[in-house]
């Protein structure tokens, strides 16, 4: 039985893309005169509206689920305007409006604007149940991802796929560009280190769109009991993975711009330490520091910011560190920031908290840092796994 469909992509092209190994290319920033207007799946209603006609629809969406071609109209509003019978909305971490802090509870509610029930998939309940899907004929997933394993929207997608598969509900995935899709990097997650911030044996920077990753999850049998989800992907039009993509809406409260998104895979490891990565400032994931002058010359003081960062690490303490806001947007993953902070800390094992290994997807990274290995030595140890992943990834590449 076929469980992965690609809307309107010719069959011969699908097979070609599935088995070609595409080399990683440098990120390209076209000049205004040669700028190509891509179309996300949401901006292709001529493709998906016929698939939703006459059906009761459940949506997995948040503030990023917009139609750029309709002045950033939200997908919920657009579908209802077009007469699609939307019956409920499922939401990930950060909630429907994207204003809940990292780790903050997201509650079920009724949306005041539309009257639709909002069902949280973050917290105690992460998978849509049979009861939640009983009045739904088809589910649509449209969340802007950033291409990093510990960004939890792909974990939500995994559970949505699982819930749909277990309850025989088709899933329509609206694809969007991956702003970190031009390369892969970092350790591949090892068995026994899976969690909601890492559910799949993929590298930290995985280089896939959500549509491609859904195909991999399905094809590799990573859902519970190896169930298969009936997936249809609406691909992005006129986008390639070496094409720079600036997100029109910030994907979560603490990724406010392109620089933060490119630095995110490198700096998020500080979440597994007591070093601040700028939560509680207006430039999160663009700086790092600690209340000790030996960490660097740049100074900042994290404070509680409602809707962005409540009670951030090192709150109300002056931190010293590095300002990375002028890093080029071609920036790629590096361990150097983490190693530099570790070196000046003098804390050895106490530098890390229990969350670090979950972010890394292994305990080997922590052990290598403690052993004094360089960034180059550590990265070299990942190459065998990354080569195997490149071969796996090539089977599911759509762009």
Language-model segments: residues:
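Bacterial Sec-dependent N-terminal signal peptides
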Residues: 1-34
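Short internal beta-strands
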Residues: 85-93, 174
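Glycine-rich, charge-decorated loop segments at or immediately adjacent to ligand/cofactor-binding or catalytic sites
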Residues: 98-103, 172-194
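Glycine-rich oxoanion-binding loops at beta->alpha junctions
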Residues: 107-135
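Glycine/threonine-rich flexible loop motifs
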Residues: 145-157
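Conserved anion/nucleotide-ligand pocket segment
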Residues: 194-264
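Glycine-rich, aromatic-lined ligand/substrate-binding cores of catalytic
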Residues: 237-312
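Conserved functional hotspot residues or short segments at active or partner-binding sites
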Residues: 281-383
